[in-house]
């Protein structure tokens, strides 16, 4: 009897020690999404809550992003290891002296759009001439500005906050929207898709790849394997979230409630579905979409043209993980 007890005790101690050793071998890292908790970041939350980051050897802390905790500022200060950023934001940071580097693209297709009611008579870009257009600031105004210039439009720009009320009340003729967010809010307000005309910038040769994962150059140089494991774990988190949407939504809603944000399940479900469309387009592949050299330089040149940056960082400097192609460009 005593021998059995000793054997069981030894097994428990061994498994406990093994677990502690595994925990001690985890590398600590921090990550901040570029906005407040919502299904736009479901893959990262899912990977964390289901132990995927730990499986890849990472003891991750996920910080709460949003307007009060800008990911770009924390990255600039070196207060976070990894961040999700829009490509436009990351290029401006790098060109401005903050050595952020691109680890992977997450969304290659722009979800930014303009929306007009059919009752306004706006059916094509030229119909916006002289109209009142709601526009966000910062990175969100780069594509609309290029769009208006492309079609030689003189519009009345109206600063747009986080609400679509100006559009619903006809105080503006056209509103800015993200496909996975505000567009669905418009539909929930009582307007049907067949009552709206949508203008996706990606359909007008102004596609800007959006969300990607980034770190500082020194983080990558110090531990490139950690960076790759973080990317792979994040990818697996997104696949898991899409394969188990109900579980992923529960996780997202919990994060939103903890951040004291209003949580609407149908809206978050729409957002999660659209994220799947944006990340994988047709079907789930074995990895995140790749940022192409063509797309990188296209966006960078637009930023230089509107004087957001003074020079274009080379792909070699900006994308240390970038796969070389046979027709790549040299320094710009």
Across the structure, where does each feature detected by a protein language model lie?
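Short, surface-exposed acidic
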Residues: 154-157, 193-197, 258-274, 309-316
């Amino acid at each position: 009897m005593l021998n059995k007890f000793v054997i069981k005790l030894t097994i428990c101690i061994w498994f406990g020690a093994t677990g502690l050793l595994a925990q001690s071998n985890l590398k600590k890292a921090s990550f901040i999404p570029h906005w407040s908790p919502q299904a736009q970041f479901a893959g990262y939350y899912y990977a964390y809550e289901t132990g995927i980051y730990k499986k890849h050897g990472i003891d991750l802390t996920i910080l709460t992003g949003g307007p009060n905790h800008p990911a770009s500022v924390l990255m600039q200060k070196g207060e976070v290891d990894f961040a999700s950023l829009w490509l436009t934001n990351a290029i401006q940071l790098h060109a401005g002296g903050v050595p952020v580097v691109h680890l992977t693209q997450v969304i290659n297709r722009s979800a930014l759009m303009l929306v007009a009611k059919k009752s306004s008579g706006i059916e094509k870009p030229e119909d916006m001439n002289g109209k009142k257009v709601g526009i966000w600031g910062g990175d969100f105004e780069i594509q609309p500005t290029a769009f208006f210039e492309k079609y030689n439009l003189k519009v009345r720009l109206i600063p747009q906050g986080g609400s679509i009320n100006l559009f619903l009340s006809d105080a503006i003729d056209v509103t800015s929207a993200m496909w996975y967010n505000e567009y669905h809010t418009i539909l929930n307000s009582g307007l049907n898709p067949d009552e709206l005309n949508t203008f996706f910038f990606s359909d007008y040769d102004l596609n800007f790849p959006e969300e990607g994962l980034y770190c500082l150059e020194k983080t990558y140089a110090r531990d490139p394997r950690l960076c790759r494991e973080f990317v792979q774990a994040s990818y697996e988190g997104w696949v898991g979230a899409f394969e188990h949407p109900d579980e992923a939504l529960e996780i997202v809603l919990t994060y939103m409630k903890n951040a004291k944000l209003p949580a609407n399940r149908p809206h978050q479900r729409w957002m999660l579905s659209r994220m799947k469309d944006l990340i994988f387009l047709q079907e789930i592949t074995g990895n995140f979409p790749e940022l192409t050299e063509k797309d990188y330089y296209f966006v960078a040149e637009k930023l230089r043209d509107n004087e957001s940056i003074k020079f274009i960082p080379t792909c070699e400097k900006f994308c240390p993980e970038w796969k070389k192609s046979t027709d790549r460009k040299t320094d710009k």
